[in-house]
Amino acid sequence: MKKGQIAEGTVNKVEFPNKGIVYTDEGERIIVKNTIPGQRVSFAVNKVRKGKAEARLLETIKKSPLETADTCTHFGTCGGCTYQSLPYEDQLKIKEEQVRGMMENAIGDACAYEFLPIKHSPRVLAYRNKMEFSFGDAYKDGPLALGMHKRGSFYDIVTVEDCRIVDGDFRTILMATLSYFGEQGISFYHRLRHTGYLRHLLVRKAVKTGEILVDLITTTQEWSNVPVQETDERAKIEACLLYTSPSPRDSTSSR
């Protein structure tokens, strides 16, 4: 295949890290990330090296027969989850195959070992006790957003008010924080322009006590002296500690 070529094919399997092995109707093999076995997808080839082609996913033409699970409203747009549309058992099978493949490639016949199955998580949803959300915008120069990066994008942010891998306290804090800073007109940090204040919102919840720590990561630029403590009051969360962490780091890799 040639660079820039657009084609379609069926995902045969997924190798680590989330590299879908896609075969066209002509039998050509292409790597397309963020795909699920059984999907029919269209893609644009962006790299060809030593006879191996890699491509960018354009569209899921047909869902996989495995995709029967309920998803949050952000799935497919948000880059946080890849396999949420699959039943948990099928998610484990894919991950187990990936680990097994890496073990076989690394060890081969060098020594004998016993490959044990993945141990099930007691929670399928709302299992995260720590999340770091990013401030940004959903599109260039759009309104303030707070959440996860869009799938395949380094810049755009999806506000994940319906995120299912965290519990309701995380979502409440996220939306209260976004509302607060949106009303105050406080900007996120633009790495290319070197302007703005807000970087990340880190939330950690203790499993046994239910206590919550909220850390607002910001730049060291001047800020409007609005009392940040109001944010956790809006969220109406008990046992919540809030503090800010100014970070002097700069980067020129963003818009």
Q: What do these predicted regions represent?
A:
Residues 1-249:
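Accessory RNA-recognition modules of RNA-modification enzymes
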